Amino acid sequence: MTLNFRLLSGHLGAEILDFDPRDEFNETLTAELRLALQAHHVLLFRGKPLGEEQQVRLTQIAGVLTYRGYGNYTDPDQKSSLVSNAHEGGLFGDGELSFHSDLSFTPHILKARSLHALILPTYSEAGGETLFSDVQAAYDELAPQLKAAVEPLQARFCATYDFGDRSEVVEFVRPLIGTHPQTGRRFIAASRAVTKEVIGMERAEYRPLLKALWAHIEQPQYIYRHRWQIADTLLWDNIAVQHARTPFDPKEKRALRAVSVDDPAIAVTPTQPSEAVA
């Protein structure tokens, strides 16, 4: 089988057509899907209701199932988490989320992630859209003067976990410009959500640089804006792109199931500590 797809935007995104992720697929098709993900960074599978195991199988074309990061994985059978304001214990329930790559505030940025739409706001203009930015293309087209200024710089990436009875700050120092471990392409790691300061510089010096990078990656030519439909699944390369969420009416219910994968050397099991919450 040769995959058919429809491009979603100029720089990134492809809807996979004539393929049902609920069906069994062989190594040849798995390899095609991996190549499509490498080429387009974000893959859309539209209108196919997936159970957890089916979503896990699809996401694992990009890596090994991991329990690193969001959620308290105490059940060995738990393979996903919920981004939801409709379920007790749901993560990041509502409100706007600025551009970021998941777990960029830890030693290893998460390799890939999928989201599957379970519950959505009842009217189309309610918000809650997911935006993706091609931070590799954005790096390629960065102004030479700005590129030279930020190439050698390292920054503090930081996030706060709220565990209900306590909060915990997790942070890591990494370069503003990274190299994709699989493809070798350079990408802009700086994100509005979690990049807090540049090491060795005063705020008056680094804020203009960070603002310039943020504004650059958020330009329309680098963005794919996804308007969710029930049973949509998005799978993305979490290093090649950053993502964000538009705000939505908190009275509206929204729930997406998330599955995360890593390289085998990075992935952790439910019995291992997660570096993001340790």
What are these regions (language model features)?
Residues 2-233, 239-278:
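Non-heme Fe(II) oxygenase catalytic core, chiefly the N-lobe of the double-stranded beta-helix
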